[in-house]
Swiss-Prot record:
Organism: Streptococcus pneumoniae serotype 4 (strain ATCC BAA-334 / TIGR4)
Chief localisation class: cytoplasm
GO BP field: trans-translation
Localization in the cell: Cytoplasm
Alphabetical keyword list: Cytoplasm, RNA-binding
A Pfam family this chain is assigned to: SmpB
Function: Required for rescue of stalled ribosomes mediated by trans-translation. Binds to transfer-messenger RNA (tmRNA), required for stable association of tmRNA with ribosomes. tmRNA and SmpB together mimic tRNA shape, replacing the anticodon stem-loop with SmpB. tmRNA is encoded by the ssrA gene; the 2 termini fold to resemble tRNA(Ala) and it encodes a 'tag peptide', a short internal open reading frame. During trans-translation Ala-aminoacylated tmRNA acts like a tRNA, entering the A-site of stalled ribosomes, displacing the stalled mRNA.
Sequence similarity: Belongs to the SmpB family.
CC terms in the record's Gene Ontology section: cytosol
Gene Ontology MF annotations: RNA binding
Keyword S-adenosyl-L-methionine listed: no
Coiled-coil stretches: none
Name listed for the protein in its UniProt record: SsrA-binding protein
Length: 155
């Protein structure tokens, strides 16, 4: 865990496989009472999520927060759009980078920090299939090197 980070509730491992992460930033999430209870219970899925900048606001879409079991009538729709809290300058910078370079905003992880739900957003560029194969090859080569080094060190 990085400095100042709280309890990690959910991670989007597929994001680092499908995208090249250029920059990350922390954003607050606007949630209802039953949603924050579900998040604290780790009942959240970031897999297909993405964020968009619309009218000077950042919105999180396609993130599934399961309905709280004891929430009855107060439960919200599981995949509704949720507002993210960022400073105005951060939003303007993101908007420029997204429009100019064809990048996207991907949720990387959700954690609880000082009692508040925070989202780590990644400014990302999509990988092509051959980029993914290169990443896999590089990872396997590093594993092989580590395996050989371990064998040498044990002798």
């Amino acid at each position: 865990m990085a400095k100042g980070e709280g309890k990690v509730v959910a991670q989007n491992k597929k994001a680092r496989h499908d995208y090249t992460i250029v920059d990350t930033l922390e954003a607050g999430m606007v949630l209802t009472g039953t949603e924050i209870k579900s998040v604290r219970a780790a009942r959240i899925n970031l897999k297909d999520g993405f964020a968009q900048v619309k009218n000077g606001e950042v919105w999180l879409s396609n993130v599934h927060i399961a309905p709280y079991e004891e929430g009855n009538i107060w439960n919200q729709e599981p995949e509704r759009r949720r507002k993210l809290l960022l400073h105005k300058k951060q939003i303007q910078k993101l908007e420029q980078e997204i429009k100019g370079t064809g990048m996207t905003l991907v949720p990387l992880k959700v954690y609880i920090k000082d009692g508040y739900a925070k989202l780590l957003l990644g400014l990302a560029k999509g990988k092509h299939d051959y980029d993914k194969r290169e990443s896999i090859k590089r990872r396997e080569q590093n594993r092989d090197i580590a395996r050989v080094m371990k064998a040498v060190n044990q002798r």
